[in-house]
Amino acid sequence: MKLLTKANRDLRRRGNVRRYTAILLSLIIWILMCECGAADSAFRYEVAEVHPVAGRQGICTEAGYYWVSGSGTLTKYDADWNLVVENTEPFDGYELEVNHIGDIDVYHNELYLGVEYFMDGEGKNIQVAVYDGDTLKLKRVFPFRSDTGQMECSGIAVDPDSRTVYMTSWIDDKSSEYLYMYDLDTGDYKGKMMLNPGPKWMQGIACYDGHLYVTSDDGDADDLAPDHMYRIDPSQSKETGTVLLEKTFDDVIMQGEIEGLSFDKERGQFLLLFNRGARIVAGMPAGFYEGYSEEIHEVFVYDMTEAN
């Protein structure tokens, strides 16, 4: 009994240390951003709508349609958020074993996905995959460069202006200090952009108005500490990117896990996929918070106005 009690105390102590470390890291990042003048957002955001969806990972929009990714699903919605089509077996056709989709993007009715095999906070067999926007079926796969240092893929974004596909890494190591770039037309690896300072636990990425935006799961739901979005100003060479604090998500229904993002250029709106109800440990569900028996996935639609 004494040994069991001591083990429980040790587990509780380690859990508290991890929690306090996460809070401290969030505070340090926030202070660094503010000292760099990064508290000045490019836009103001006001929640206009909230829609429940059938996926917990990513969101993108084009031509009046919305696409949502789950860890192992793809779903398309119309302009009124009615279900159009769903693919519950999106991994058909792969040569390497994969089980996880992150944040997604769309360009000319083709969906761009970062696909991998993800387990216990680690990723492998990473691939850049392109799906048909109507059928949600796999069309082609980019050749992935395994020597770039990228250890995971949490999100993907298409920049038509520079013909670049950007990828993020969620794992909290050296690989998450960069964005990884591929050529939109050829699929060739173009290099990586070092982020200064590097956000932690990046979940999604999107391109808008000449900037890159990333969401970071750098809050702590246990302590109601919110997650954040950062704006990235790339250098002309795209070798480095200056990271600025864009938004603190203290306006969601309940603190949980931030995920993918997208910008609706036609409507001037910002879209955020956010999960609540489930405890997440090392990127994996580990039970539920009080009052929840399942995880709830929602897209928050924000109206945007220029801040300056």
Predicted stretch roles:
Residues 71, 116-118, 169-172, 217-220, ...:
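Short loop/turn segments immediately following the C-termini of beta-strands
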Residues 73-78, 120-129, 174-181, 221-233, ...:
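Structural motif
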Residues 83-118:
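Blade-loop segments of beta-propeller domains
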Residues 63-64, 108-109, 161-163, 209-211, ...:
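Short coil/turn segments that connect the beta-strands within blades of beta-propeller domains
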Residues 46-72, 100:
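Beta-strand-rich domains and repeat architectures in extracellular enzymes and scaffolds
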Residues 44-46, 84-97, 138-152, 192-199, ...:
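Surface-exposed loop and turn segments in beta-propeller and other repeat-based domains
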Residues 53-60, 95-105, 147-158, 198-206, ...:
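Repeated scaffold domains used in trafficking and secretory/extracellular systems
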Residues 197-238:
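Loop/turn-rich, solvent-exposed surfaces of beta-rich toroidal or solenoidal domains
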